[in-house]
Design a protein with these regions (language model features):
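Contiguous beta-strand/loop segments that form the cofactor/metal-binding neighborhood of enzyme cores
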Residues: 1, 193-266, 286-302, 318-319, ...
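N-terminal Rossmann-like dinucleotide-binding module
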Residues: 1-52
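Glycine- and charged-residue-rich phosphate/anionic-cofactor binding loop of Rossmann-like
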Residues: 30, 277, 295-312
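Conserved SAM-binding strand-loop segment of SAM-dependent methyltransferases
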Residues: 56-63
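Short amphipathic alpha-helix with an adjacent loop that forms part of the alpha/beta core around
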Residues: 63-73
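Beta-strand-loop-alpha-helix segment that lines the small-molecule cofactor/substrate pocket
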Residues: 76, 82-134, 149
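C-terminal capping/lid region of NAD(P)-dependent oxidoreductase domains
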Residues: 125, 152-155, 321-335
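Predominantly a Rossmann-like dinucleotide-binding segment in NAD(P)-dependent oxidoreductases
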Residues: 133-210, 215
Length: 335
């Protein structure tokens, strides 16, 4: 009988508790340890495990203590904490030699991404960033077909995403810049940026951006005009206030086809020539742990790799720099 993979959790908030409801039923894994600075959050996740009839995981207030004491008792770690903590915690997990499933976004800056990549290369562990779009069958199929040349050359990209985010997260840590790493563009908008980075299969070359905080401490609206290193042009628009709801449209204009898809990979429309194929829909993944395990076993492409995270970080750093300079063009130098 195959031994279960021993899972450690860093950040036992609502997202982790939500996922735990399904993960605790998986025969492949068991919750072995968890760390959170809040006792209520730790107990909530422990209660999920106990309610499922599984052993109680060890609880820690400090993730560093968990890694120090349980390093030999863990196989994989899931990190779900405010964005600004990702880099330090992810790097510590990699240095401990443990495979990592990391909530999006991977890190907040290029410098953090480079440090994490160095730790990953030294230890050889698997690191996957949990973007729904990156794990979506429709997004991955689109990537495969684009790379195979089915759609022709990429000409341009138009991406839009919106949500009643400003009011939805009023007072939330996501609107505290010291721990969020950014506003709407870096939170919900991150899904759009990541799907664009993944499907464009190219780093960005130059970026011009504007942001409007609309009275908040973080960006609520963002407009980006950019050129990619493969020659394609792109516009990205993020509106973090409006009527209730959340949606996205991204259009990829190729020389042989037009592909429309949402940031999470929930639907796709493809037009080839004068023929428009019916809209395809796919369930946005409710249990991404299964995909993480498939990637870990080499059965699935790692679309959430540290290298993809670096591409994303380069774009985000350039957007921030340009917006701070009132839209001045910023050139991205990718090593």
């Amino acid at each position: 009988m195959t031994r279960k993979l021993r899972l450690g959790v860093i950040g036992a908030g609502l997202k982790a508790a939500e996922y735990a409801e399904s993960w605790v039923k998986m025969p492949e894994i068991e919750f072995a340890a968890l760390a959170d600075t809040t006792a209520v959050s730790r107990q909530r996740l422990i209660d999920v495990c106990l309610a499922a009839g599984t052993p109680e995981p060890k609880g820690f207030e400090d993730y560093r203590q968990m890694l120090a004491e349980c390093r030999g008792e863990l196989d994989i770690v899931y990190v779900s904490t405010p964005h600004a903590f990702h880099a330090e915690q992810a790097t510590a997990v990699a240095e401990a030699g443990l495979d990592l499933f990391l909530e999006k976004p991977m890190v907040t800056t290029v410098a953090e991404a480079e440090r994490l990549i160095a730790a990953q290369k030294k230890s050889g562990v698997t690191i996957v960033t949990a973007f729904q779009g990156g794990l979506s069958p429709l997004v991955l199929d689109t990537r495969r077909r684009a790379l195979a040349g089915e759609f022709g050359a990429l000409i341009a990209i138009s991406g839009m995403i919106w949500e009643s985010w400003s009011s939805n997260y009023d007072g939330h840590w996501k609107q505290q810049p010291d721990i969020s790493g950014g506003g709407f563009m870096f939170d919900t908008g991150a899904h759009m940026m990541n799907t664009v980075c993944l499907l464009a299969n190219s780093d960005f070359d130059s970026v011009s951006a504007y942001m409007n905080n609309h009275g908040r401490q973080v960006d609520i609206a963002t407009a980006v005009s950019a050129r990619l290193k493969n020659g394609a042009l792109a516009t990205l628009t993020a509106a973090g206030e409006g009527p209730p709801g959340c949606a996205s449209y991204i259009t990829f204009f190729y020389s042989k086809a037009i592909v429309r898809i949402d940031a999470w990979g929930g639907w796709r429309e493809i037009s080839v020539g004068r023929t428009a194929e019916p809209r395809e829909e796919a369930e946005i993944l409710g249990n991404p742990m299964k995909n993480f395990l498939a990637i870990r076993e080499g059965k699935m492409e790692n679309s959430g790799s540290v290298e993809m995270g670096l591409r994303f970080a380069r774009l985000w750093d350039a957007i921030k720099e340009s917006a701070a300079a009132d839209g001045a063009s910023v050139r991205i130098v990718a090593q």
